[in-house]
Amino acid sequence: MADQLTDDQISEFKEAFSLFDKDGDGCITTKELGTVMRSLGQNPTEAELQDMINEVDADGNGTIDFPEFLNLMARKMKDTDSEEELKEAFRVFDKDQNGFISAAELRHVMTNLGEKLTDEEVDEMIREADVDGDGQINYDEFVKVMMAK
């Protein structure tokens, strides 16, 4: 995962890592993580800090070393990319840019993709995604449908 990062990104993350690694021993402890997060206005509990470390602590030693930190950052960046892609896809469907995908907009895009759908099929697609029942799909509903794929 970390091998998809550029040299610039890696040196940027090295800098960030050193900010976390207060004593310079090459590992981030829960205490160091807590200090940095509190300086950023967060107030994580000891358990939350432990969870965050466990999430990326590949060798199970209770701390995060630089390779583990890089994997975490690469994962977070991948998540951001897919969020950007979802926003872009939503904009494609949302022709009038009002923040909602209507049945007409959905039909238009599907037709352009070569999908000939009946009104019933389009209505069914809207109904499946339309959590709040307003007859159109907002961004959150769109994300739910796309992430379920």
UniProtKB/Swiss-Prot annotation:
Pfam families recorded: EF-hand_7 (PF13499)
Residues binding Ca(2+) 2, per UniProt: D57, D59, N61, T63, E68
Binding site for Ca(2+) 4: D130, D132, D134, Q136, E141
Modified positions (N6,N6,N6-trimethyllysine) in chain numbering: K116
Positions with a binding annotation for Ca(2+) 3: D94, D96, N98, E105
Binding site for Ca(2+) 1: D21, D23, D25, C27, E32
GO molecular function: calcium ion binding
Keyword Kinase: no
InterPro entries referenced in this protein's UniProt entry, alphabetically: CALM/Myosin/TropC-like, EF-hand-dom_pair, EF_Hand_1_Ca_BS, EF_hand_dom
Modified residues (N-acetylalanine): A2
SMART domains hit by this protein: EFh
Function comment: Calmodulin mediates the control of a large number of enzymes, ion channels and other proteins by Ca(2+). Among the enzymes to be stimulated by the calmodulin-Ca(2+) complex are a number of protein kinases and phosphatases.
Family the entry assigns: Belongs to the calmodulin family.
Note: This protein has four functional calcium-binding sites.
Protein name as catalogued: Calmodulin
